[in-house]
Amino acid sequence: MTSPPSPLDFFWFIPTHGDGSYLGSEEQQRPPEFGYFKQIAQAVDRLGFPGVLLPTGQNCEDSWITATGLATLTEKLKFLVALRPGVTLPTFAARQTAALDRLSNGRLLLNVVVGGNPTELAGDGVFLPHDERYAQAHEFLTIWRGLVSGERVNFDGKYYRVENGRLDLLPSQERPPLYFGGSSDAGQDLAADLVDMYLTWGEPPALVAEKLASARKKAALRGRKLRFGIRLHFIVRETEDEAWRAADRLISHVTDAQIENAQARFLNQMDSVGQRRMAELHGGRRDRLVVSPNLWAGVGLVRGGAGTALVGTPEQVTERIREYQAIGIDTIIGSGYPHLEEAYRVAELLFPRLGLGTRRQQAHRDIANEFSVGFHGAARLQASS
């Protein structure tokens, strides 16, 4: 007998850089407007998603300000917000953390983003090489963790110096959890030392298993345990043909020139090991997009970061998710284009098979029973009249 899958958290995504029905085209695009973010956040809150990721970068609305607004408009939804070592001070970030966690009644999660694009980082005033950014992040998180845990912090390091640092107003949570993704040795060392949830982009299960085993071993050597999550897009439809047609439609406006430019940018302008691994899955070729059963790399032809999607029927996608769970994944951060409609598809088609959103499913059954009783009762009255 196989053991039952471990409990699964299934987060969604707020597209603070804009949204749309097609990649590589301005047709049917949605601008990054707070009203639209509100629609998505309130929908996924009702649908049973426990949380959302808010991205960060020069082309995104600020994740902290956006999350603050959305927290006042939602009930249970958690917000995974970017913590940016090097871009802000750890002491100021700790005060932000405490304030937003209190405002949201303990619904704040932190996504540590060290950055993988030196050009964009230079625009933010960060000029450190790859491994030094992780060394700086280690100092940043050491100070941040101490402050949000209520400690008085004195620290004298290479990148930061703090004397008698403290928070007078602490977070609602004992310490908001730290999420982090980094594929390099320096990134995994940081995760093993200081973070709670180690994230990976959606590579084939065998590659994910290797990465998780490495991070798990590093953490064990430090006497720590990590949880593991994966970042994926989703294209789920009632039939396999519908799902693959939707995938093809998503990139139907992408030109060869756009692919060439995007791949050159990923490989030449970025020093992210994770981004390189994403690009190597398909090599910029349209005929190499199915990189594993139901795992499609079409998104990564032109989109940086998470570049793969699970494509198929609810049964097929559930099977793939169970494979990731079997190697240690207990959290999914999902998305789909456009994000409002695809949130409903995932919740309605996939959640029942994953055993998620059970409260909402029971409400649907209650409504169905009510209509059924009403219909049959009316039929009996009509027959007897």
Swiss-Prot record:
UniProt xrefs under SUPFAM superfamilies: Bacterial luciferase-like
Gene3D superfamilies associated with the record: Luciferase-like domain
Gene Ontology terms, MF aspect: alkanesulfonate monooxygenase activity
Matching CDD domains: Alkanesulfonate_monoxygenase
Swiss-Prot/TrEMBL catalytic activity: an alkanesulfonate + FMNH2 + O2 = an aldehyde + FMN + sulfite + H2O + 2 H(+)
One Pfam family linked to the record: Bac_luciferase
GO biological process assignments: alkanesulfonate catabolic process
EC id: 1.14.14.5
Keywords: Flavoprotein, FMN, Monooxygenase, Oxidoreductase
Described purpose of this protein according to its UniProt entry: Catalyzes the desulfonation of aliphatic sulfonates.
Family membership noted in the UniProt record: Belongs to the SsuD family.
Annotated protein name in UniProt: Alkanesulfonate monooxygenase 2
Organism encoding this protein: Mesorhizobium japonicum (strain LMG 29417 / CECT 9101 / MAFF 303099) (Mesorhizobium loti (strain MAFF 303099))
